[in-house]
């Protein structure tokens, strides 16, 4: 390993090289996270497209789903800290899908104990140009 030294140049966000460097740097962290979650038997699917990452939990119980998301977020934010990276809390969102016909009022995900905020579920979710609603009606 080389010694640590200061660098006064970088790659801009609009550069074609940015997503490649981001993926090369972040992919080992995602791999480590997946191994941690598997060992802890926490069922979470991780999807990443450039710098947009998703933790997906499927459960009929909000408590179970939120618990899985909380643990995943905690482990991932700690991994990021070890690599001198941080989660942009203001960009963190939670969204629940439910196709039942009854009242749908999902609980928030409280991340305040992890130096983050309380995530209140959104009514719509925009991801990579697609707009989703809670019932997946795509109107």
Regions found by a protein language model. Give the residues of each.
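Catalytic palm active-site di-aspartate
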Residues: 10-18, 40-61, 80, 84-96, ...
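Conserved pre-motif C helix in the palm subdomain of viral-like polymerases
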Residues: 7-37, 137
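A generic structural signal for short coil/turn motifs at secondary-structure boundaries
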Residues: 58, 62-66, 139
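Reverse-transcriptase-like RNA-dependent polymerase core
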Residues: 1-4
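Hydrophobic (often cysteine-bearing) scaffold residues that line and stabilize catalytic clefts
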Residues: 18-25, 46, 68-72
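Ordered, helix-dominated protein-protein interaction surfaces in large eukaryotic regulatory proteins
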Residues: 24, 28-31, 71, 78, ...
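Inter-domain linker/hinge segments that demarcate the starts of reverse transcriptase
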Residues: 65-84
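Short, conserved micro-motifs composed of acidic
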Residues: 86-123
């Amino acid at each position: 390993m080389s010694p640590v030294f200061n660098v006064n140049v970088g790659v801009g966000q609009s550069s074609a090289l940015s997503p490649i460097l981001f993926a090369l740097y972040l992919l080992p962290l995602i791999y480590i996270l997946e191994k941690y979650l598997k060992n802890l038997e926490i069922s979470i699917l991780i999807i990443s497209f450039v710098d947009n990452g998703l933790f997906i939990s499927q459960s009929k119980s909000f408590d179970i789903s939120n618990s899985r998301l909380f643990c995943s977020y905690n482990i991932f934010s700690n991994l990021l800290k070890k690599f001198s990276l941080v989660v942009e809390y203001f960009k963190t969102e939670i969204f629940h899908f439910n196709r039942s016909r009854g009242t749908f009022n999902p609980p928030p995900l409280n991340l305040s104990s992890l130096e983050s905020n309380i995530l209140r579920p959104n009514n719509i979710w925009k991801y990579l140009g697609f707009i989703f609603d809670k019932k997946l009606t795509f109107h």
